[in-house]
Amino acid sequence: SYGSTPYKKEEARNLFPIFYSIFMKCGDFRRTGSAELDMCYVACGREHGYIERDLKPWDYSAGTVILREAGGVVKNWKGEEPSYLKNEDILACVPQFEENLLKELL
């Protein structure tokens, strides 16, 4: 699933080519509108990955705990640990998708 950063529509020109590239390599995209819900969907196996730019720490902190407890991966788009003190571009996924998704995001 993905988040489209609706508060910064000017970034669509940069984001949509990334979404398109990933979409062409996967079954489908979903958008619930909730970062925490999407991360929980990855944790329970309904989704394999979730990406979104510019999330606030309260948008991804709880989902990070849940997903990691389920064996998932949460990184920023540089492949680093999120700071939890600032907005981050978040990748949340099952471990086997981490490398390929990071290549798309870098």
Residue ranges and their predicted role:
Residues S1-L106:
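An extended, acidic
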